[in-house]
């Protein structure tokens, strides 16, 4: 089964921004209702960005900083803050890793980690990886064994990304991608799924179990809801 992700995810960044974010307020000029303390905070955030040397998407980064500082008063549970901390760190690293390859189309392959190399579907995944690279695509998989390794074998290390998940009972990345710079490991499934969909021009499902079904239905849900 092959289907592309929604255009809204690929072209708009696939993110939902709460109404009246900092960048939206700056664009619309809607600052009249802001308390003086908030305006001072925003001024200091802008100074911090300038001290850092500026860069891309300064208004959006300012909004992230402002919301991060609000965690000091709004969220007492350390574990909750660590979820945000880890997710932000993982997403920033993943976006940086994919950025040099933004001009290359990519296909994500989902399938069983338990498929043995002697199985027909394993060889089919190898053949698919080889053919899709010849068509100008790169291949993204979950970096594990089975179908994921087969897709990487066909595509070759130079044309492969590995989006791994850290689990205590699973083995590490497959040998094709294990030592490559395009391998990344995630703590959370939700950030991992976002990266799969965000950077894919198409998704391919090979036979698999609950994990493959979860990934496939996640993609279908995002398509159906326009996310």
Predicted features, each with a name:
Residues 222-227:
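Arginine/glycine-rich "motif VI" loop of SF2 helicases in the C-terminal RecA-like domain
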Residues 125, 146-206:
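Acidic/glycine-enriched connector segments
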Residues 15-17:
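Cysteine-centered motifs
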